[in-house]
């Protein structure tokens, strides 16, 4: 894919993201698909051979910070990651440290660049994405405690933290106008309920904090000293009204956060910019030294990690399918699951976040659903089973993760991927261990497992694993039905994320939702999206859209089976919804 195109000599370092391209490349299609070769459109970039240049993107997920190096065609050259610590406390409290995360970012960037064989002078830009976690620091950048331990190093309220469930309910009771843009109900995972919790429980911390950041905005601030926030973060998680370019003062005053209004919202963001915008004067001398880069290296305004995955996947080339991002759903299947649809006009879907203007793709409205626990729910299901320890031993002996070993075992029992659902037998799972994010917007919902027997063997664990995956797929199917009912039509699901790396999972999602599932050829679409932010900030491409056009690749497509398999999944989906209803009635 590199040879013969002038932009092949450009290199990008990134951590998660991408979008649409008009030309088509070779696409390998599995099962009932064909392989079609189509010519790659010639680049409009200069034909001379420029010096080697690279951009870096960084992604901070729930458990690690990662960095990757890409060339201008989107090919991954090198990547690295470093683990981060998460603290769990009673009361659904989950916290992290911004200092530790920054250290992990620096290690990952240094390692990725070293593996790429590039020098600091070759790096012209860096982009960031991260989980939508809340960071509290003083005006000078010192961490501020956000939890009952009083430890200032624990200064991040992690995205999955549900301490503010009561505060979210109080806000929702007010029927505020801004709630129309979060599906009618604000989630305890969003930032204003968490800030209200701080006011009630740690008032001094609310006073001491000179800045409250979404994590990805914190990373760009620490890199550049610029306090500009991304449209993505403040619109999706802080109730900023991007379509009106304003905060709603009446909302903040009404819910008790008038202190943030008093200084003109300076502590949560006065300057709001589009993702990929070049910030400040680039890397400060201190940040550059820590990252192993040069001062002044361009830094792009950030994205939330899931949205980076959306940008990094929606533009893939699919044979015989137009690159229409309004007909594609980006589904990022990781610890949680995020499902993002774009539209040319605002579409209000009850229980689904948004519509958010320009929060992911410029000029388009974003509607965002998903589940708080997806990959985490699968991990929890496995850990609950009596055979989990034995499966772990087998997996270790085979040099595999437990999940990969279970997939291998399932494939041995069911060589045809579409028949793997039979292994679930009578077991049904509603995997809502951390509530229902959408379309019911019910943080109090809990998981349901039905159809268990006294079997404690390995193959029973395999069946539970498959049933759990089906449950994740049926939750997505339910969301798609809600979107469809309000006028958002989806033809293809574009999947990414650590929990969606296997063909078995992708085929099962296609069968469970009855919609084709496509997977980008790049192994790291979220990292790729962040690399695109860097490319835009550095001026390597004239816009983020053009970076997406040139860096998106091909897709592998998994088509849903018909007849018996389709009927079985329809019946199981009906059981899924029935169990959901009963669970609400009896709690």
Regions found by a protein language model. Name each.
Residues 3, 8-13, 24:
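Short hydrophobic alpha-helical segments enriched in small aliphatic residues
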Residues 32-81, 88, 124, 128-169, ...:
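Glycine/Thr-rich phosphate-binding loops that ligate phosphate moieties of nucleotide
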Residues 39-51, 284-293, 303-326:
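Conserved phosphate-binding catalytic cores of ATP/NTP-utilizing and phosphoryl-transfer enzymes
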Residues 60-62, 128, 140, 178-306, ...:
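Gly/Ser/Thr-rich active-site cleft segment
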Residues 80-120, 158-159:
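N-terminal phosphate-binding loop and adjacent alpha-helix
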Residues 104, 108-116, 219, 310-313, ...:
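Stable alpha-helical structural segments in soluble proteins, enriched in small hydrophobic residues
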Residues 107-124, 202-206, 251-265, 479-491:
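Phosphate/pyrophosphate-binding loops at sites that engage ATP/ADP/AMP, CoA/4′-phosphopantetheine
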Residues 302, 308-309, 313, 317-342, ...:
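Acidic, glycine-rich loop-and-beta core segments that form the ion-binding/anion-interacting portion
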């Amino acid at each position: 894919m590199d040879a013969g195109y002038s932009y092949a000599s450009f290199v990008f370092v990134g951590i998660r993201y991408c979008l649409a391209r008009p030309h088509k490349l070779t696409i390998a299609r599995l099962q009932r698909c064909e392989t079609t070769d189509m010519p790659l459109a010639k680049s409009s970039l200069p034909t001379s051979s420029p010096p080697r240049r690279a951009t870096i993107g960084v992604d901070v997920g729930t458990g690690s910070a990662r960095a990757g190096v890409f060339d201008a065609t989107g090919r991954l050259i090198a990547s690295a990651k470093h683990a981060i610590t998460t603290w769990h406390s009673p009361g659904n409290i989950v916290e992290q440290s911004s200092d530790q995360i920054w250290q992990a970012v620096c290690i990952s960037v240094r390692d990725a660049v070293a593996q790429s064989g590039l020098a600091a002078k070759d790096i012209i830009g860096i982009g960031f994405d991260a989980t939508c976690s809340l960071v509290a620091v003083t005006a000078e950048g010192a961490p501020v405690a956000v939890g009952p331990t009083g430890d200032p190093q624990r200064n991040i309220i992690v995205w999955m933290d549900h301490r503010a469930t009561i505060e979210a309910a109080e806000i929702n009771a007010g029927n505020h106008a801004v709630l129309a843009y979060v599906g009618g109900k604000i989630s305890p995972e969003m930032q204003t309920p968490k800030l209200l919790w701080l006011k009630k429980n740690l008032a001094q911390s609310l006073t001491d904090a000179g800045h409250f950041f979404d994590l990805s905005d914190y990373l760009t601030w620490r890199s550049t000293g610029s306090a500009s926030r991304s449209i993505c973060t403040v619109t999706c998680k802080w109730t900023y009204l991007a379509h009106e370019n304003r905060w709603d003062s009446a909302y903040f005053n009404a819910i008790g956060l008038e202190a943030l209004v008093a200084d003109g919202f300076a502590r949560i963001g006065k300057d709001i910019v589009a993702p990929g915008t070049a910030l400040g004067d680039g890397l400060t001398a201190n940040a550059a030294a820590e990252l192993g880069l040069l001062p002044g290296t361009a830094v792009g305004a950030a994205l939330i990690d899931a949205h980076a995955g959306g940008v990094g996947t929606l533009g893939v080339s699919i044979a015989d399918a137009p690159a229409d991002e309004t007909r594609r759903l980006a589904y990022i299947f990781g610890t949680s699951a995020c499902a993002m649809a774009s539209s040319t006009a605002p579409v209000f879907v009850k229980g689904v976040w948004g519509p958010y203007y320009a929060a992911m793709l410029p000029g388009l409205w974003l509607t965002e659903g998903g589940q708080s626990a997806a990959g985490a729910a699968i991990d929890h299901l496995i850990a609950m089973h009596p055979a989990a320890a034995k499966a772990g031993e087998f997996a270790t002996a085979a040099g595999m993760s437990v999940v990969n070993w279970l997939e291998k075992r399932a494939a041995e029992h069911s060589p045809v991927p579409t028949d793997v659902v039979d292994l679930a037998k009578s077991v049904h799972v509603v995997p809502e261990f951390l509530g229902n994010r959408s379309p019911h917007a019910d943080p109090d919902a809990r998981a349901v497992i039905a159809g268990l027997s006294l079997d404690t063997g390995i193959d029973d664990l395999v069946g539970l694993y498959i049933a759990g995956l089906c449950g994740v797929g049926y939750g997505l199917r339910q969301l798609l039905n809600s979107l469809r009912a309000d006028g958002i039509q989806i033809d293809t699901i574009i999947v990414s994320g650590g929990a969606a790396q296997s063909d078995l999972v992708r085929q099962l999602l296609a069968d469970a939702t009855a919609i084709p599932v496509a997977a980008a050829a790049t192994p790291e679409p979220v990292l790729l999206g962040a690399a695109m932010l860097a490319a835009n900030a550095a001026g390597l491409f004239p816009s983020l859209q053009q970076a997406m056009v040139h860096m998106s690749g091909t897709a592998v497509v998994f088509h849903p089976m018909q007849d018996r398999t389709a009927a079985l999944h329809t019946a199981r989906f009906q059981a899924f919804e029935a169990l959901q209803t009963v669970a609400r009635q009896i709690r």
